[in-house]
Amino acid sequence: TAIDLSDGQIPFSTLSLQEDDVAVIAVPSYGGRVPQPAVDRLSAINGNHARAILICVYGNRAVEDALVELQDTAEAAGFHVVAAISAIARHSIVHEIAAGRPDAQDQKTLSEFAGQIKKKLDACDRSVPSIPGSRPYKNRGVSAMLPKPDQHWTLISVFPACAVSLSVRTPQERQTKSISPLSAPC
């Protein structure tokens, strides 16, 4: 079963896992944080002590506090975190950053991690990994990708009588995430 955390139409508070389930919870890191809609929606799910594997994907800049924030959010929702991975992928906005990632070496490393996680699950090892990040988390902010005018900018008005409206979507409005429960009894 797959649950799309970007789908605001899902009644997340009605979702409940079983203790012998394994959930793979994957989110992007935007500005070193988990997108707020993912935090809100994951928080509404009843994890019921299901084991959780966390994956935070970032665009080759830094994962910063996103993985530890995901851990805290998952644990507060009742999940039991047993593994965590930060994975590099092509940047979601500037596609030239980390182009070609994950590459063959990344895939090999991820495959090795998957093998280690499978062994841990098979052994019913519920130890919590040490996950990097800071508490309190860094402040949320507007993406550095948005231009910030300063004294060197010049306003040029070509059509002063026309009203122009631009829709600026924040990174939090562009995310896609999923959580996939897997059956692995312990």
Q: What do the PLM-derived regions correspond to, one by one?
A:
Residues 1-8, 12-148, 177:
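FMN-binding flavodoxin-like domain, especially the glycine-rich phosphate-binding loop
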Residues 162-180, 186:
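Iron-sulfur cluster-binding cysteine motifs and their immediate structural context
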Residues 132-160, 165-170:
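A mid-sequence, solvent-exposed acidic-amphipathic segment
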Residues 28, 150-153, 185:
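Generic detector of bulky aromatic hydrophobic side chains
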